[in-house]
Amino acid sequence: MNHGGNSTMRHCSMKMTFNTDYDNLCIVFKSWHIGNLSQFLLSLLAIAILGYLFERLRSFTSLKETEFQRGYAGQQSEGLLTHHSKSLKSGRPFRLCALYAVQLVFSYFLMLVAMTYNAYVILAIAIGAAFGYRRSHCDTVQTVGLCH
């Protein structure tokens, strides 16, 4: 067994303080191992896209919740809850719960990405989320989530 210092194996570098290093950075998985600047820049782009998609998902979920609440309130106030409309509405709460679960998993994944403590990675999340927020909420006010 050779334990010499000339090994070509690269190991993930896990820093527990804020940093700007990218050499040997692993993001969430060992297979997402960054060894050079071009890989780092591509990863930042991918992370920004993830931030963007997360905000778009949040907007879509919010829209579907609002549509459901308006539709349910309208039917309830008019007394039009027939057996047919009840059966159509019964799948909606499940779909809303599923959307929420996807959003929750997505937000935790972004949190794990941010836990690299790399300033550029965190900035990429923020930039992507900001673009997604801007694209989704041009004229509306939305509360900001805390897990991203």
Curated annotation (Swiss-Prot):
It is a multi-pass membrane protein. Keywords: Copper, Copper transport, Ion transport, Membrane, Transmembrane, Transmembrane helix, Transport, Vacuole. Residues 1-33, 130-148 are extracellular. It is found in: Vacuole membrane. Residues 55-108 are cytoplasmic. The keyword Ion transport applies. GO terms for cellular component: fungal-type vacuole membrane; plasma membrane; prospore membrane. Its main location: membrane. One of its GO terms (molecular function) is copper ion transmembrane transporter activity. Induction: By copper deprivation. The chain crosses the membrane at residues 34-54, 109-129. One of its GO terms (biological process) is copper ion export from vacuole. The keyword Endoplasmic reticulum does not apply. Homotrimer. Belongs to the copper transporter (Ctr) (TC 1.A.56) family. SLC31A subfamily. Mobilizes stored copper from the vacuole to the cytoplasm under conditions of copper limitation. This is Copper transport protein ctr6. It comes from Schizosaccharomyces pombe (strain 972 / ATCC 24843).
